[in-house]
Amino acid sequence: RQAPVGGNEAMVPISYETRVAADAAIAAAPRSQAAQGDQDVALTPDPQTGNGWHLQALRALEAQGVDVMRAPVTVGIMDQSVDDTVPDLVGQVDHDKSVSCSFNGIPNRDPAAWRWDDATHGTHVAGSIAAKHDGVGVDGVNPTLRIAAINVASRNGGFFYPEYIVCGFVWAAEHGISVTNGSYYVDPWKYWLPNDPEQAAGQEAVQRAVDYATSKDVINVVAAGNFSTDLDNLPTTDDSAPGDTWGAHERDVTGAVYMPPKLRGTLSVSALQLPEGADPATGVLEPASWSNWGATSVDFAAPGAKIYAPLTSWYGKAYGNLYGTSQASPLAAAVIATLRQVHPEMNAEQIIALAKKQAGDPANWDRLKPVEGREYRGAGLPN
């Protein structure tokens, strides 16, 4: 699947020639006063960083310039793969903490197993979090974070099966990974029925794996999904599954669970878009039309439309825009991981409380446009 989370996710690659021409103009242009903020250290963004409105929305560039002690923190990218050969990710991926779980859920540390150049989703996610600050390309939200590639998708089709997901959470728990990002839903069922003997074991196994990671102080951030669905009131019928073979059929899904956003121990993130003409640093943001929502099911709302980050080497020296809650959740994960850097004395529960407190600050909360009958904001905008 091109869109691991599912729904209306899309990619818009930017040609190398266009980027080269843009680099010179962007590098020569001064940063806006709104984006500069109160910095302790002068920071010149990488040339194409101006394409990333999300960095201004999260005040990420200001945070990068703050001179503060930062503890080492690794974010686990539970996704298709991460191509650490692209320029902005060279040196950002910790090979000792990276793994593929995509063969029967058995860990394989061979880089060839977790580094694919023909599946760009995980690379884009990793780059949006931690693309390095090196004078070329773009900046991630926090280039000082480390990345662990945790491949939890099949090579053919990009399916995310329970045994792969279990392997990923257990690996993160046992290898010192502080935060995971999960931009996917669990295959082959869109909605898992806990009373169906063919589905109950898979659902329970994934829930136990999340519980295990939580017990090891891991914070697990996940995409809310792209089906324009109220996660508080899931549909009672579905005709999209099983999704990995012919024969999808309508079935009763009353009482089903949508994994992972509805699992205990996950933080679910909905997607925001920038209205035309709005200032990304100060303007009011609105929910993307395709984003899932839910007053009790969503924890944060973060930018998820037109998110600019690196693509795999298969595309050449390329960057591109992706759209989806797959892009929103890594931005929230990056903010949470930054809090873990700055507050190593805090446990996961305390960090989550702090992240929600900051997201709900009026300076952040008031930027989220309320929508009647569609509560998508969670605690607010991570910052």
Regions found by a protein language model. Give the residues of each.
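C-terminal subdomain of the subtilisin-like protease fold in secreted/lumenal serine endopeptidases
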Residues: 175-184, 341-383
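Protease zymogen maturation seam
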Residues: 2-74, 82, 87-88, 92
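Loop/turn elements at helix/coil->beta-strand transitions in domains of secreted/extracellular proteins
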Residues: 32-33, 70-75, 143-148, 174-180, ...
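Active-site-proximal loop motif in hydrolases
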Residues: 65-85, 96-137, 150-163, 193-201, ...
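Surface-exposed intrinsically disordered loops and tails
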Residues: 44-52, 100-118, 188-201, 230-259, ...
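Substrate-binding/access-modulating region of protease and related hydrolase catalytic domains
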Residues: 152-263, 313-330, 342, 375
